[in-house]
């Protein structure tokens, strides 16, 4: 019974974290082509160039990276991350369809989107679930090398949104930087809050042979 309750709690956290990310990206950041780094940054670029829906791109890029890292991940970690990716991507697709182009204030949207993004990712990290391919890498580096995962994610994301901005518009670089700084602070804040732990959710990674 106790294990069932813990699994239910984990599922709830994955859904909440994924929906928060999808809400922040779809309603506040993607309408302004603000790259959030990682798969979402690539999704912005693909939508700009080929009009591919953000949700599909976010899912495809993240899952591709996740399968690439499969040999380092235990199946439990892999399935949890896959679930969070799917919830986020579906949320983006739903919010894009239900609330198309409802935003107008760039800086208010930027702040709102960054906070929601940070809350979603931070909540997933807190329960040892990655938010995607880049998130899995940041979490692994944090575990094995030390440091806050949000800061590590910031460094990797900077590379992605610099490439994206060079193609779309260099003006979004400042917006992306501000988004990353805000969301990183929120991620680290949530990650370091003492919450009820789930004992069986210790991150599982395979040792190199």
From Swiss-Prot:
UniProtKB keywords: Cell membrane, Membrane, Transmembrane, Transmembrane helix
Family: Belongs to the UPF0750 family.
Bilayer-spanning residue ranges: 10-30, 41-61, 82-102, 105-125, 154-174
Pfam family, one: YitT_membrane
InterPro entries (UniProt xref): UPF0750_membrane (IPR051461), YitT (IPR003740)
Lineage of producing organism: Bacteria, Bacillati, Bacillota, Bacilli, Bacillales
Organism: Bacillus subtilis (strain 168)
Disulfide-linked positions: none
Official protein name in the record: UPF0750 membrane protein YitE
Location, primary (coarse class): membrane
PANTHER family registered for this protein in UniProt: UPF0750 MEMBRANE PROTEIN YITE, UPF0750 MEMBRANE PROTEIN YITT-RELATED
Subcellular location: Cell membrane
Primary gene name: yitE
A cellular component term, taken from the record's GO annotations: plasma membrane
Membrane topology, record value: Multi-pass membrane protein
């Amino acid at each position: 019974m106790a294990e069932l309750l813990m699994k239910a709690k984990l599922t709830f956290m994955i859904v909440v974290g994924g929906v928060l990310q999808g809400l922040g990206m779809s309603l506040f950041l993607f309408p302004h082509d603000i790259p959030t780094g990682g798969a979402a940054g690539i999704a912005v670029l693909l939508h700009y160039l080929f009009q591919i829906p953000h949700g599909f791109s976010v899912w495809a890029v993240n899952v591709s990276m996740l399968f690439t890292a499969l040999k380092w991940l235990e199946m439990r970690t892999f399935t949890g991350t896959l679930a969070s990716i799917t919830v986020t991507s579906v949320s983006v697709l739903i919010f894009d369809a239900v609330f198309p182009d409802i935003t107008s204030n760039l800086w208010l949207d930027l702040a709102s989107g960054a906070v929601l993004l940070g809350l979603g990712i931070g909540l997933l990290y807190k329960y040892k679930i990655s938010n995607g391919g880049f998130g899995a890498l940041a979490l692994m580096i944090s575990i094995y090398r030390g440091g806050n995962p949000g800061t590590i994610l910031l460094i990797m994301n900077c590379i992605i949104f610099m490439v994206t901005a060079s193609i779309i518009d260099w003006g979004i670089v400042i917006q992306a930087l501000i988004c990353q700084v805000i969301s990183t602070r929120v991620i680290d804040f949530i990650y370091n809050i003492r919450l009820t732990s789930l004992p069986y959710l210790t991150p599982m990674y395979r040792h190199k042979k």
